From Swiss-Prot:
Protein name: Betaine aldehyde dehydrogenase
Annotated residues for binding of K(+) 1: 27, 93
Gene3D superfamilies per UniProt: Aldehyde Dehydrogenase, Chain A, domain 1, Aldehyde Dehydrogenase, Chain A, domain 2
Binding site for K(+) 2: 243, 454, 457
Lineage, broadest ranks: Bacteria, Pseudomonadati, Pseudomonadota, Alphaproteobacteria, Hyphomicrobiales
InterPro entries noted in UniProt: Ald_DH/histidinol_DH (IPR016161), Ald_DH_C (IPR016163), Ald_DH_CS_CYS (IPR016160), Ald_DH_CS_GLU (IPR029510), Ald_DH_N (IPR016162), Aldehyde_DH_dom (IPR015590), BADH (IPR011264)
Pfam families: Aldedh (PF00171)
Similarity remark: Belongs to the aldehyde dehydrogenase family.
Keyword Cell division recorded: no
Cofactor dependence: K(+)
Cofactor remark: Binds 2 potassium ions per subunit.
Amino acid sequence: MKAQPKASHFIGGAFVEDKAGKPPPVIYPATDEEIASLYSATPGIIEAAYAAALKAQGEWAALKPVERGRILRRTAEILREKNRKLSKLETLDTGKALQETLVADAASAADALEFFGGIISGFNGEFVELGGSFAYTRREALGICVGIGAWNYPIQIAAWKSAPALAMGNAFIFKPSENTPLSALALAEAYKEAGLPDGLFNVVQGYGDVGAALVNHRLTAKVSLTGSVPTGRRIMAQAGEQLKHVTMELGGKSPLIVFDDADLESAIGGAMLGNFYSTGQVCSNGTRVFVHKNIRERFIERLVERTRKIRIGDPFDEATQMGPLISAAQRDKVLSYIKKGKAEGATLACGGGVPKLQGFDKGFFIEPTVFADVTDTMTIAREEIFGPVMSVLEFSDEDEVIARANDSEFGLAAGVFTADLSRGHHVIGQIKAGTCWINAYNLTPVEVPFGGYKQSGIGRENGIAALAHYSQIKTVYVEMGKVDSPY
């Protein structure tokens, strides 16, 4: 099973190779089989990407916004036309079940391109009347923007970052995770097919040193990262030394609160989506599930029953509901957290082991895991695990659960399940998190902003807000009379 691209990098509208770079192997997580071999970007590759971006950006920014938007919308159409092919590529690259990638990856990328391509012509500055004279503002491109992606949603992240950047008239250089380098190249081909001028979307592969080179490059105007909090701190410090714009979409340990009047099946479904989708490798997951004491036993009993029915196996079988984790290292990390949870006194309600799957004995699979009797101070309730491990905590009243939910360095997301919408709005209003749901979880339409509070990030992806993060404001004062000067 191979998925070797034409070359490692895409620069100036063409595939480019330089075999002097360190070769990161591309592994299919379900079998531990190498499916492609790419080369990390050398300094020459990086400089070529900036030269191509610099050459193209000025003319692109000068185009009418509606013309830029037309190309983005055409790219969205191409992604939808090729959705099954792209979804299979994403499944190979990530190990995620095809059942998921068909609806959540290239499809979401297309949604972002269509959205930003449609609204950019209406994203304008302000006019201010000043008693005869007036002022106006212009939204202008930043220049060359850099995106650094994560391995859980490769093509989605590449589009979520590049679509608003390109819509605003910027050029874009994207570095995928070294674990999942393939689909960003497919997105580059789609942009090319749609008519995007050469040099505006470039892909360079590599490890953290390549990302650091992009962040520190003198021509980089903005950096957008999806990654861990430690990586975000490091990149933000580097960018801050040169006062570069940043968007940081980082980790979380989000609370999901279930009151005793909630629809039990919906709440359980939301908790499962918020812990087991993409094998738990979602930054916004609601991994601290607070359940009211009156329904705790019923909730856990039904949760365990439904969790044990999750189908784990061949990611290309569309009946499969959960694939493997991204790597052996990630599987071992998750297993270490499960071990720690048991050692600290949490009750293992189900899962916790490595399933035996015929034909996939070398894959990085793990059982969906539920812990009960979890307390706020346990490691599994404090640290981001990034795997299918749910912690169920009991609470008694509203004020208590709000305080406990907020007792975290993270603030990416939160959810509330209740039949009382007034209470739902009140609780969400008190939660310190940037992306919240009432009677739902982990739904992320591109029309609304996505991002976090506290250590979970700065700036926003998606929604009209994203355009503001890829632009700068110019204020112009126009005097309609003579200059009144005391000199």
